[in-house]
């Protein structure tokens, strides 16, 4: 992966909608309620989304957090939903309110860098099934709330610092994880009175003040009856569980199953599944080697899920193994659909499920046959509104490296008709919304007459190495730009396949990307002549990248093989830096970046502009690596559609409000032919 992808990237919104208004927005509409209406950018932004779900101990219910964006208010509606898993009852809300919780990560010695993506944590059921605990954020602080299956939500904690996770220790007590940062942040504010010492605490890309170094998370145990804090009682570890086990289950009829690294000294080596049953270890061959990402056990039976990858065309598989009766596992399901957060409920697996043409639903998968049926669809009104066709394509580059993509074509496409092609990156799985970061609306492009290729990047060269640590792993990818060359070769192979089929017009190809996808755009614009227009959501690696982000990040780049700050190495940058190749750049480039990351783009934009290259850049306020604000996401969608219409279809938008934009783009057209 590129250094740009190693970056990660409090939101201020208008007054929230009332719970009653939000309930109306969140309620699933009747199937076909919008039948016959064309899909619009606003419809995609306003889809009802949920992350992980959890199943009650008795297997009768699932709980999940549902959210829906509102671009008109630049806000979100959020609700705790209870879904019946048996019978025909309707899903119902137990709580409505709160704000989205954004993901945070520690990176390069800097704590709690906000990514912009919304956390997908599931509500958690008490062991007796009487209470559900969940995280809810209000007025910028995340606390623990509880509700019963009958409703009656209430706030349990009033922590000074955000609650980060919650789990049950008994049916009446909760273990809550938090990070005490308020004192450290106050100390940094006091430091500012005399000026901040610039050091490795700075993530200068995002803000002009230091962050506290990562501090340990702490645990508090709370009684749910009155919120009283009680002594922490950590669960006793299972003495049979190896410390190296990544996944682990106990087999009720006597045994255990777990995954662990096959070669523990490798930084990113594969994990393999091991099964012990009634005192003996049972081999299951290649099926249990790598890609096992979930395990369940019931009676004498083990179920496990193998995730898709670039080499197998992204196919997800579920296997069932009756240890008392079957010599080896048997596959009960193979699918191109994406499955999320599966949990065993009786004889069924309950999973979040996405298809290429429909967003996430809650589905039940029969653990004996693999038969699947939908339990809950929060976007039933989308049925019939996406009329594009989707085909999974697989290809191999000249070096034998495999990957895949999804070809999306407009309804009524005639074989042999060459269409302008837009390529979206860099993981093609589940509902084809907008690529990684969700900025390039795949189905809207197809509905406007484009062929769209949603691609999955190949595994990096370092994935087959014995690299012992992250720095060694990255150094393999950076040396000779090995990873970028591999991704470019795969990209070219996918394009060649569509040109050979008569689908893609080779003179009208557009390329898009965020994060690692932006790195692919950057490399392709220098090393290929096939791209006629491009759009980036993050930009760009250049000789100034390290110092733009901060000292700790710059240290990492140097360890990976980048030139040290202050050193002049044009030979290193020539194959990759747009700034170093600005004089040759003629491909129109649209850059839409966040205010927390735009500094990384300044050298590249300035060099391209000075060279009279066709470039335009927008900076979105209060955003991070992934854009979060609904009104910004809508603006990004619409501008990307207009950009490629202008350059690949020669169709300026007729919107009177866009006259100034069209005049600028016409001026850029003169630059592109200089």
Where are the regions that the model predicts?
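Multi-bladed beta-propeller domains
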Residues: 16-49, 83-119, 136, 146-164, ...
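Predominantly five- to eight-bladed beta-propeller fold
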Residues: 21, 26, 77-81, 85-86, ...
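Beta-strand-rich domains and repeat architectures in extracellular enzymes and scaffolds
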Residues: 38-80
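Blade-terminus and WD-like Trp-Asp/Gly-His loop motifs, strongest in beta-propeller folds
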Residues: 53-62, 121-131, 139, 165-174, ...
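Structural motif
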Residues: 73-80, 140-145, 184-189, 215-220, ...
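Asp-box/WD-like beta-propeller blade repeats and closely related beta-sheet repeat scaffolds
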Residues: 108-119, 136-217
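Cap/lid segment of the alpha/beta-hydrolase catalytic domain
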Residues: 376-501, 514
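Active-site-proximal cap/loop segments of hydrolase catalytic domains
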Residues: 455-674
């Amino acid at each position: 992966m590129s250094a740009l992808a190693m970056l990660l990237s409090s939101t201020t919104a208008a007054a929230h909608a009332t719970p009653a208004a939000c309930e109306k927005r969140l309620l699933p509409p009747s199937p076909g309620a919008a039948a016959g209406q064309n899909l619009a950018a606003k419809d995609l932004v306003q889809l009802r989304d949920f992350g992980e779900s959890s199943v009650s101990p008795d297997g009768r219910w699932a709980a999940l957090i549902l959210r829906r964006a509102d671009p008109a208010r630049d806000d979100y509606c959020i609700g705790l939903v209870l879904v019946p898993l048996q019978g025909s009852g309707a899903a119902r809300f137990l709580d409505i309110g709160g704000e989205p919780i954004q993901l945070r990560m520690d990176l390069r010695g800097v704590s709690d860098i906000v990514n912009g993506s919304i956390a997908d944590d599931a509500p958690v059921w008490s062991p007796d099934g009487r209470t559900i605990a969940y995280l809810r954020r209000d007025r910028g602080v995340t606390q623990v709330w509880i509700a019963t299956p009958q409703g009656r939500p209430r706030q349990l904690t009033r922590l000074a610092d955000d609650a980060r996770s919650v789990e049950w220790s008994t049916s009446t007590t909760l273990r809550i994880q938090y990070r005490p940062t308020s004192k450290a942040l106050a100390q940094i504010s006091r430091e500012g009175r005399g000026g901040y010492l610039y050091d490795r605490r700075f993530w200068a890309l995002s803000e002009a003040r230091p962050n506290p170094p990562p501090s340990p998370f702490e645990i508090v145990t709370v009684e749910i009856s009155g919120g009283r804090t009680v002594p922490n009682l950590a669960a006793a570890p299972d003495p049979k569980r190896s410390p190296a086990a990544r996944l682990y289950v106990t087999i009720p009829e006597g045994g255990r199953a777990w995954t662990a690294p096959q070669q523990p000294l490798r930084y990113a080596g594969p994990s393999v599944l091991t099964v012990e049953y009634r005192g003996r270890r049972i081999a299951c061959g290649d099926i249990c080697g790598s890609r096992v990402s979930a395990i369940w056990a019931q009676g004498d039976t083990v179920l496990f899920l193998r995730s898709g990858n670039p080499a197998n065309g992204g196919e997800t598989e579920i296997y069932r193994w009756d240890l008392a009766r079957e010599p080896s596992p048997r596959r009960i399901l193979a699918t191109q659909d994406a499955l999320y957060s599966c949990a065993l409920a009786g004889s069924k697996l309950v999973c979040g499920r996405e298809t290429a043409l429909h967003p996430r639903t809650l589905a039940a998968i029969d653990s004996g046959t693999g038969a699947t049926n939908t339990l809950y669809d929060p976007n039933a009104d989308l049925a019939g509104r996406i009329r594009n066709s989707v085909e999974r394509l697989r290809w191999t580059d000249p070096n034998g490296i495999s990957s895949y993509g999804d070809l999306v074509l407009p309804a009524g496409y005639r074989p042999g008709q060459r269409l302008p092609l837009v390529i979206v990156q860099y993981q093609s799985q589940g509902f084809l919304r907008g690529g990684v970061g969700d900025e390039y609306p795949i189905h809207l492009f197809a509905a406007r007459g484009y062929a769209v290729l949603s691609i999955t990047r190949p595994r990096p060269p370092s994935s087959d190495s014995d690299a012992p640590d992250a720095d060694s792993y990255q150094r393999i990818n950076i040396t000779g730009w090995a990873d970028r060359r591999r991704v470019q070769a795969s990209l070219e192979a996918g394009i060649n396949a569509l040109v050979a089929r008569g689908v893609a017009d080779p003179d009208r190809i557009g390329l898009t990307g965020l994060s690692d996808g932006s790195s692919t755009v950057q490399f392709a614009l220098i090393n290929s002549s096939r791209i006629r227009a491009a759009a980036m959501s993050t930009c760009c690696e250049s000789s100034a990248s390290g110092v733009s982000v901060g000292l700790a990040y710059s240290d990492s780049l140097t360890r990976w093989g980048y030139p040290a700050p202050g050193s002049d190495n044009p030979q290193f940058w020539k194959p990759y830096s747009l700034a170093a190749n600005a004089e040759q750049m003629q491909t129109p480039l649209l850059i839409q970046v966040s205010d927390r990351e735009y500094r990384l783009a300044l050298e590249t934009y300035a060099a391209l502009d000075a060279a009279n290259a066709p470039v335009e850049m927008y900076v979105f306020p209060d955003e991070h690596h992934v854009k979060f604000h609904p009104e910004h996401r809508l603006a990004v969608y619409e501008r990307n559609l207009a950009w490629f219409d202008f350059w690949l279809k020669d169709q300026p938008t007729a919107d009177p409000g866009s006259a100034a934009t069209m005049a600028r783009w016409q001026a850029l057209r003169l630059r592109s032919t200089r």
